[in-house]
Amino acid sequence: EVVRSNNFDPSKLSGKWYSILLASDRKE
């Protein structure tokens, strides 16, 4: 979807995944 692609925020997505990876790493 073009509209959704326009609203895409790479930095926000990266930060979100970074937090998830950190939490996942901490669990292990």
Curated annotation (Swiss-Prot):
- The SS bond pairs are none
Keyword list, A-Z: Olfaction, Secreted, Sensory transduction, Transport
What is any one GO biological process for this UniProt entry?
sensory perception of smell
- Indicate where this protein resides in the cell: Secreted, Extracellular space
Q: Which domain of life is it from?
A: Eukaryota
A Gene Ontology cellular component where this protein is annotated is: extracellular region
Tissue expression, per UniProt?
Nasal mucosa.
Main location per the UniProt record: secreted
Protein family membership:
Belongs to the calycin superfamily. Lipocalin family.
Role summary: This soluble protein may play a specific role in odor discrimination and perception.
Q: What is this protein called?
A: Odorant-binding protein 1
Q: Report the source organism.
A: Hystrix cristata (North African crested porcupine)
